[in-house]
Amino acid sequence: MKLKRIILLLLTVMFSFSYGEVFAKDGSSLKKALKNKFLIGVSVNTHQSSGKDVAAVEIVKKNFNSIVAENCMKSSVIHPKENKYNFAQADEFVSFGESNQMAIIGHCLIWHSQLAPWFCVDKDGNNVSPEVLKKRMKDHITTIVKRYKGRIKGWDVVNEAIEDNGAYRKTKFYEILGEEYIPLAFQYAHEADPDAELYYNDYSMAQPGRREAVVKMVNDLKKRGIRIDAIGMQGHIGMDYPKISEFEKSMLAFAGTGVKIMITELDLTVIPSPNPNVGAEVSASFEYKKEMNPYPDGLPEEVSKAWTERMNDFFRLFLKHHNLITRVTLWGVADQNSWRNDWPMRGRTDYPLLFDRNYQPKPVVGLIIKEAEKTK
């Protein structure tokens, strides 16, 4: 183990001096190296899908063969009022993917967060009836999925429906329809586009309670003949969580249901969490404290090396099980694009992605490419 660490650190130093230049000259890229392993994807924001962030666009085109919409397909954006859809940004996103021959992922159809305020309530703010919510869900899902039928490879149909302990999250959807809202969402999506792949996506999937609940949910869907193609394991990870062994246990457990695995929303935070138990709960918010923002001017060398080793270890795991995984998606192009800078505490400086704030590949990119090239 000690020898492995020494070798990795030596490689990291070497790549930090040479990889950016080599990367530019020899045509190396993540998507080329991973071509026969799995899709390598990235979330894009509207500045990128519109072409305004030119440097980011070049990174995306060179390194990634799949894209997912970071925000523009969430209901609060695409369907802000019951009888009003805003398709402009989503249309632009899909066109960007098509023009660059990418596998396009729709994110997400049913999610309790960033939910259009009208969706589950009447004009007085009271919960609508089960019949009304079913109708609204079907209209929302059918309208969006049919619009992009044949153009989007797959959809995150339901997002983050399970708690760490395995209980169903007490969302408006659950309050009104119970757990039945999940099979209904998958049913409506399949009816709208029978050829589209359908996914369930969630965070903290290494938690045993969530692992067991997701396995049960997927098995129940399959027993009922409801299509589900893959489980998305969000990769919002830290330097000391989750244990790679627990993450691997979940991968194998999910694969045991007969569906494929997707590593989604991958980022590795290097700054401390004000609460280690928030997972990736977007509603979490803490007041800024200077001591919780330890690296505003850059990472110390030892911290950078440790980050490189940890990210490389996860990619080594993904490559080990590339027969089970169909896609690995980063949650952002370069460090300055990451939501981690403002969650769960606004105004911090984090370094969670594969490309730095100057749009340069980090040393780990070279290590991933090397690892992919030697993986059978």
UniProtKB/Swiss-Prot annotation:
Residue ranges that the Swiss-Prot or TrEMBL entry lists as coiled coil: none
Domain GH10 as annotated: residue spans: 25-371
SUPFAM superfamilies the UniProt entry points to: (Trans)glycosidases (SSF51445)
Pathway(s) of this molecule: Glycan degradation; xylan degradation
Record-annotated active site: 160, 265
Broadest EC class assigned to this enzyme: hydrolase
Swiss-Prot/TrEMBL catalytic activity: Endohydrolysis of (1->4)-beta-D-xylosidic linkages in xylans
GO biological process, one term: xylan catabolic process
Reported induction: By xylan.
InterPro entries with a match to the protein in the record: GH10 (IPR044846), GH10_AS (IPR031158), GH10_dom (IPR001000), Glycoside_hydrolase_SF (IPR017853)
GO molecular function per UniProt: endo-1,4-beta-xylanase activity
Enzyme Commission number: 3.2.1.8
Entry keyword set: Carbohydrate metabolism, Glycosidase, Hydrolase, Polysaccharide degradation, Signal, Xylan degradation
PROSITE patterns for the chain: GH10_1, GH10_2
Extent of the signal sequence: 1-24
Family (UniProt): Belongs to the glycosyl hydrolase 10 (cellulase F) family.
Name of protein: Endo-1,4-beta-xylanase A
Lineage: Bacteria, Pseudomonadati, Bacteroidota, Bacteroidia, Bacteroidales
Gene name for this UniProt entry: xylI
